[in-house]
Amino acid sequence: MSVSRPARGADPGLSARPMSTFPLGPRRVRRSGYGAMQLAGPWAVNAPPDRVSAVGVLRAAVAAGIDHIDTAQYYGPDVVNDLIREALYPYPRELAIVSKVGVFRDVGQDARQLRQGIEDNLRSLQVDQLAAVNLRLPSPGRVDARFDDQLAAMVRARDEGLIAGVGLSNVSLEQLRHAADGTEIACVQNLFHLADRDSAPVLQECLRRGIAFVPFCPLGLPRGLANPVLTSPVVVRTAIRLGVTPPQVALQWLLQLAPNVLLIPGTGSTDHLLENLAAEHVTLDDQALRELAGVGA
């Protein structure tokens, strides 16, 4: 599937317009990016079954115009960053690589460990600065001294030039407001998709403040695992009616939801990568939006 050709059900006029972008820290990126987690398997704990194919997916992403790749040193662990470096180094100037620190297998980290995590990412990716790094929390919660210490460590890393932007991940509305009142936040990465909209208040606060909102698991769960998004009768029926695929419906719903949404769907398949990118050209009509509003309700 050609990324430049609209999928069936798309607005043909969209393909002739510039791709939609939104600020990610000090730069602007295309709203459709790529999440590299699945290159280390469904739960990011293995080497890729086909390293050559994994490298090919990354190169295809950049060739297709993706300029925002999400990763983490603990994917594998020590696998995905190495793949990115092998596939793409020296990196295109416009490529924004975003990583995350703060949680390793659900264990929260202190300021010293956060700094070490940032340095590990820089080393493995062979860069002097990352476009942004997300402070990943075990779960959304209350503001406390530990959160302030972690946030201060991230700000120091930005002030020292190790990262261009401070991001947050898995945060509550209270934590977002507290952080954004004290420093510039580049992006927020929370669980959000058609069937799980608990972070809607966080998304709206990000929109109000001009912060990029990056839903993780935008398609529900990795392909091959049962999930309430891609198997939803409403999503499937909408895809059939519009002549597109269920993932394209789910991704375009997110894009139409708010202009600050940046997508990072993951896949280990070049075909699926291009299918996901083609979601940019899909138009969800009023009927589709009405019916999709009830998914997960």
Predicted regions and their residues:
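Acidic (Asp/Glu)-rich catalytic clusters
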Residues: 26-28, 63, 85-96, 122-128, ...
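Beta/alpha (TIM)-barrel catalytic core signal, keyed to glycine-rich beta->alpha loops juxtaposed to Asp/Glu
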Residues: 11-16, 138-297
